[in-house]
Amino acid sequence: ARAKRLCPHAVFIPPRHSLYAEVSRQINAVFKRYTPVVEPLALDEAFLDVTASSKLFGPGLEIARRIKREIAEETDLVASVGVAPNKFLAKLASDLDKPDGLVWVRDGEERQFLEPLPVKRIWGVGRRSAEVLERMGIITIGDLRRVCPAHLAQVLGKHGEHISRLARGLDERAVVPEHAARSISHETTFAEDVSAPEEMRAWLVELAEQVASRARRLESPGRTVQIKVRFHDFRTITRAVTLEHATYSSRELRQAVDLLFAERLGQAAEPVRLLGVGLSGFGDVDAQQGDLFSHAEQARDTTLDDVLDRARNRF
């Protein structure tokens, strides 16, 4: 809607979600030939832990080459791959040589790899943080690594501690397969901060529907709905509500998000950089108790959600 307002004469090409989803499934099938430990990051991105696969398929670099080759043969698409000791370094490496690159960060060479890169390459260092760091004389990741972590924490708060660890190549997060995840979430980061409450609400509703659709696909209804808000100054808050029963109904998730939005952001004047919606507390959707009216409503939700899912996959 915003793009149309800014560029009323632009030609907009409708997305083909069903095609994207099918190609994503093909690529995911290639990943799972080499490891069951696959954590989707987006339709076209994922983290793979191939630690236990080396005896069968060779070292990580060889597995990466094979995956690139098989994706090209089966989908006619190129892929950029980063091979590294942890998730942060692997993601950074994969971004350095798009669209058809292969970057290997050897164990023990993290410092040499990171040293010359601009500090903006670190997750969470946006324009404002980069400006603060630049005023401190910090231009590269190497510059950042040489700054005392305590001083960074004074300047940037807990965010400073986090980026200090990343600057030293430290990232302890495990690769979490989708089926083992304790929550389902979607979030979006805006190129420009969003200030209008109605625009924030529209984004949260869209994210809630994405989460509900994914939960239905995974057959993982949940009781706890959460919103995540990152403001322009990188302060991040989360707010959650626990429902009476587990659900993956789009209507119920939208209602929960509306409630959380009204409580925290309905009158917000602060610009927002990121919004997210999550679902957790997985249980049995059939555990819902209620009268005939609630069961009729549940049946209607199921029908509507089926229509929504088919429409989402089609368009």
Label each PLM-derived region with a short phrase:
Residues A46-A52, T238-V241, Q288-S294:
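Short, hydrophobic beta-strand segments
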